[in-house]
């Protein structure tokens, strides 16, 4: 019931954006977060899972762009026979006219503006184009038009128009944009011999071509040039963290990777240094838990060493390996970082666990707001829920009017230069713990004669020596019972170097009659001031209280009025030697501290400040 209530309350507050009360604040530096990530990596199998075959050969989709995978485009950017082209066509769409303007495969521009299909020897005037079958002639200006001018006989010395205006003219065989001229099929950009053409730089047979195996951009320097990659060793990474104010963290993991593989020129042993970098945002999910989420992940390669077991050209292989690994390692290593951060997120979620508070209650820490990231520390605001064993929630301060606001969490002091973590516990939280003990009756105690050796005999004779009327009513010595009860919740006040606990108690003096009938002699109100000291054992805050002073007030008496001051020394001794040991025994179970990021507070420096108890490591 208690767990269900906490989860429900937390979920409602988180979804509705309600800021819960903060009773505990944890600050950690980047070193603590880095140690938590390193410890998670060492304890998990996340990095060992990378010892497997590396998937290559599909060109690789960047880890950060995995969501934009698309089918292959209809138009490619290969330049085997020109610029952009349709499969089965030679078509220039970028003003690089290999055979003139736009044309189909096998066509050439004639002097009259029509296109000749060179795949067929017979050609006839355009007026009969429609009778020659499809695809023989068409107009360059109008693809739907098939007409050509009728050819006439040439006079002696006359240059044919097809040569003057075609072969030598613009768009002709040798003219600007022609088949052999600049920008033509042989020399133009994207042409047969031009840049990106069949034989040109980057072309089919040129430098970087598919058959230029040893050239830059050849098959050896493509993903297909290396196969069978397998990661055989991955060292535990060296983790470094940089805080990004208002965002999260910048994570860097430096590791060494050993890879085996094969290339066209031999077997490979590859050793590479990898720096995995990730921008991580600190968010809060709908259930109120903080989450570290990768926004971008990259791998930076350095110090690549390639050993060829059989083969030549190591420099060429170095370049190939560098490109291949830069393409595939992000897909392999970045998901591992995501898994590691998921495990760290699980550690953050452990703070929400329900922890027993002795046998009488439990404590649960919940996140009250989105964590704060500054350039110096990460701050986590926690709300502490204290519950009774029966399931009721302790809502401190009890007994106060509901309209009175709770005291706000004070500002934390600056972190010291050598401080990595700082846990601030409010006086409200400590009061809630004592309130739970009070409601369970754990602070109530009955003290009888002989229970504590250091106390004087608790009899009517001892009391009668101080109050004569007691001796008169009970001339025969009878045993007494001192019944101490704490009807109201104690309060904790924290001041500079001083922790004060105020406990209001009632002390009822009861005499036991021979027939087991109990008679009350008097009822005294006792206001006590206790001085508290703190220590840490394991993952618990230990509280030890010491009696400082008492103040008595006689509420009722069955032996007449008397000056209660005469009982002050006796009552103070009873509280010091009986009540305080019993209370400290209850407090001895300790107060559970938040379990988060594997922080060890056992050797923490403890400072008592105004309304704050601060543990620093």
Curated annotation (Swiss-Prot):
GO CC, alphabetical: cytoplasm; extracellular region
Domain of life: Eukaryota
UniProt keywords, alphabetically: Cytoplasm, Disulfide bond, Glycoprotein, Secreted, Signal
Leader sequence residues: 1-17
Location in the cell: Secreted; Cytoplasm
Cysteines engaged in disulfide bonds, as pairs: 297-334
Keyword Acyltransferase: no
Molecular function per GO: lipid binding
Keyword Cell inner membrane: no
InterPro entries membership: Bactericidal_perm-incr_a/b_dom, BPI_fold-BPI/LBP, Lipid-bd_serum_glycop_C, Lipid-bd_serum_glycop_N
Gene3D superfamilies reported in the protein's UniProt record: Bactericidal permeability-increasing protein, domain 1, Bactericidal permeability-increasing protein, domain 2
Region of interest (Disordered), residue spans: 124-149
Primary localization: secreted
Tissue: Highly expressed in olfactory mucosa but undetectable in thymus, kidney, lung, brain, spleen and liver.
Residues modified by glycosylation: 275
Function statement: May have the capacity to recognize and bind specific classes of odorants. May act as a carrier molecule, transporting odorants across the mucus layer to access receptor sites. May serve as a primary defense mechanism by recognizing and removing potentially harmful odorants or pathogenic microorganisms from the mucosa or clearing excess odorant from mucus to enable new odorant stimuli to be received.
Protein family (similarity comment): Belongs to the BPI/LBP/Plunc superfamily. BPI/LBP family.
Protein known as: BPI fold-containing family B member 4
Organism: Rattus norvegicus
Gene field: Bpifb4
């Amino acid at each position: 019931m208690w767990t269900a209530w906490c989860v429900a309350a937390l979920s409602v507050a988180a979804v509705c954006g309600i800021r819960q009360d903060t009773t505990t604040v944890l600050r950690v530096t980047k070193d603590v977060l880095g140690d938590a990530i390193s410890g998670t990596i060492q304890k998990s199998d996340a990095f060992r899972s990378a010892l497997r075959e590396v998937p290559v050969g599909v060109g690789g989709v960047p880890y950060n762009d995995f969501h934009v995978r698309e089918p292959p485009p209809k138009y490619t950017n290969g330049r085997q026979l020109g610029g952009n082209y349709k499969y089965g066509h030679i078509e220039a769409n970028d003003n690089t006219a290999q055979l003139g303007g736009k044309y189909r495969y096998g066509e050439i521009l004639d002097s009259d503006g029509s296109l000749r299909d060179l795949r067929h020897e017979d050609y006839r005037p355009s007026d009969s184009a429609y009778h020659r079958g499809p695809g023989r002639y068409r107009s360059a200006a109008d693809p739907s038009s098939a007409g050509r001018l009728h050819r006439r006989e040439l006079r002696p010395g006359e240059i044919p128009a097809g040569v003057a205006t075609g072969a030598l003219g613009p768009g002709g065989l040798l003219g600007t944009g022609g088949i052999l001229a600049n920008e033509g099929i042989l020399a133009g950009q994207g042409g047969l011999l031009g840049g990106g053409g069949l034989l040109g730089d980057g072309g089919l047979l040129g430098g970087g071509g598919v058959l230029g195996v040893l050239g830059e951009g050849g098959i050896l320097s493509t993903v297909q040039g290396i196969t069978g990659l397998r990661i055989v060793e991955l060292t535990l990474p060296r983790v470094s963290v940089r805080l990004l104010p208002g965002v999260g963290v910048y994570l860097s993991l430096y590791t060494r990777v050993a890879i085996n593989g094969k290339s066209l020129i031999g077997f490979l042993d590859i050793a590479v240094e990898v720096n995995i970098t990730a921008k991580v945002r600190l968010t809060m999910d709908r259930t109120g838990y903080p989450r570290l989420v990768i926004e971008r992940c990259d791998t930076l390669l350095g110090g690549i060493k390639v050993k060829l077991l059989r083969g030549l050209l190591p420099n060429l292989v170095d370049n190939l390996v560098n490109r291949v690994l830069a393409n595939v390692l992000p897909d392999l290593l970045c998901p591992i970082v995501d898994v590691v951060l998921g495990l760290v997120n699980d550690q953050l979620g452990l703070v929400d666990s329900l922890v027993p508070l002795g046998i009488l209650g439990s404590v649960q820490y919940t996140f009250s707001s989105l964590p704060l990231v500054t350039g110096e520390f990460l701050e986590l605001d926690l709300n502490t829920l204290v519950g009774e064993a029966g399931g009721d929630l302790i809502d401190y301060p009890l007994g106060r009017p509901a309209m009175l606001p709770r005291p706000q969490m004070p500002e934390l002091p600056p972190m010291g230069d050598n401080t990595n973590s700082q846990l601030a516990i409010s006086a409200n939280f400590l009061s809630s713990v004592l309130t739970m003990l009070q409601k369970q009756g754990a602070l109530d105690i009955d003290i009888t004669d002989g229970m504590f050796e250091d106390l004087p005999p608790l009899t009517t004779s001892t009391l009668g020596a101080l109050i004569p009327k007691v001796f008169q009513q009970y001339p025969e010595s009878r045993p007494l019972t001192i019944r101490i009860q704490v009807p109201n919740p104690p309060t904790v006040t924290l001041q500079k170097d001083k922790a004060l606990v105020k406990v209001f108690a009632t002390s009822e003096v009861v005499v036991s009659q021979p027939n087991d009938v109990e008679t009350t002699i008097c009822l005294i109100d006792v206001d006590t001031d206790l001085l508290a000291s703190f220590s840490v054992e394991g993952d618990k805050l230990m509280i030890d209280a010491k009696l400082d002073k008492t103040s008595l007030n006689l509420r009722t008496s069955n032996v007449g009025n008397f000056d209660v001051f005469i009982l002050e020394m006796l009552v103070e001794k009873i509280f010091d030697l009986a009540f305080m040991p019993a209370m400290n025994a209850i407090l001895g179970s300790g107060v559970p501290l938040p379990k988060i990021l594997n922080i060890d507070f056992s050797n923490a420096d403890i400072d008592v400040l105004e309304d704050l108890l601060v543990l620093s490591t």
